[in-house]
Amino acid sequence: MKDEVDRYLEFYGKDNINGFFFDEIASDTLKQVNYMKEIFDYVKGKSKSNLVIANPGAPITDAISPYADIFVTSEVSANVYVNKFEKPKSDFEKNKVNAKHIWHIVHSANPKEYARIIRLSRERNAGWLMITDDVMPNPYDREPSKFVEMVNMINK
């Protein structure tokens, strides 16, 4: 992973990179936590201002919480987000002061559900939110319907 970070910095130029998004991270074992710490320290060693986003797509442990600036702690369909949300396990996620470090991604949402999802994200301490009505297998390949209306709802 460090080589990959270096390749990006070399190719794009360190002044053109503001951070890194690490997908599919895990935090179940000490080895996984230590690996994320190593990556986090390496990226921050390149520039303290680099943003580190880690995406486990699920609740995190307190052990890993220091090793990213933002964690994607929920990446699910609107149905799951509304009806079967996996509650946080860590004190980190439950602490309101950490909302700025928590990001929820909700796909397959009907635009009529946007307001409800926004309300739930606030109740669930997510300071960052992405909603799309796009669906699997790649729900991130187009702009969400009613995007401007959604942004206005979020900014209320």
What are these regions (language model features)?
Residues 1-156:
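Glycan-processing catalytic domains of CAZymes
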